[in-house]
């Protein structure tokens, strides 16, 4: 996680992050903290303020530019395409539009292909935060486009 904090501090921000580890280890918590760091009103930071509107709304789960998806319940390619249809639009409030896809390994093969197209040429204003308990089930084409952190 030091590498993640250093990257934010230096402004080296990747377009896709993969957090893997056992259930309950904090994958989505770290992803939400990263979303705060990317969208904090005080600027891109490894230590978001936690008090600005953006940080508070992310904490409360109601920040319009943080789109959270549970892939376990949305495995179909149509769900993924619906999600990705909005990728080209700029963020409404934040610096970045952040897509947090939990249990990403549950997506179908066709869904992975749809996601891959966006990961190959992501808009500058979009960041993908992927979380999984089973990274071995992810296609190598997805893995190769993500900065990976095993927790």
Over which residues does each language-model region extend?
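P-loop/Walker A NTP-binding region and its immediately flanking N-terminal helices
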Residues: 1-149
């Amino acid at each position: 996680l030091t590498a993640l904090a250093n990257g934010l501090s230096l402004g080296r921000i990747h377009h896709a992050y993969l957090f893997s580890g056992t259930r309950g280890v904090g994958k989505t918590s770290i992803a939400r903290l990263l979303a705060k760091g990317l969208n904090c009103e005080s600027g891109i930071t490894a230590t978001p303020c936690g008090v600005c509107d953006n940080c508070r709304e992310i904490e409360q789960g109601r920040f319009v530019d943080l789109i959270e998806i549970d892939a376990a319940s949305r495995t179909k390619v149509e769900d993924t395409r619906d999600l990705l249809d909005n990728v080209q639009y700029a963020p409404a409030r934040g610096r970045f539009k952040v897509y947090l896809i939990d249990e990403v390994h549950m997506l179908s093969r066709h869904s992975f292909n749809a996601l891959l197209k966006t990961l190959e040429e992501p808009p500058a204003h979009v960041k993908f935060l992927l979380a999984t308990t089973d990274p071995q089930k992810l296609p190598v084409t997805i893995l190769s486009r993500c900065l990976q952190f095993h927790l």
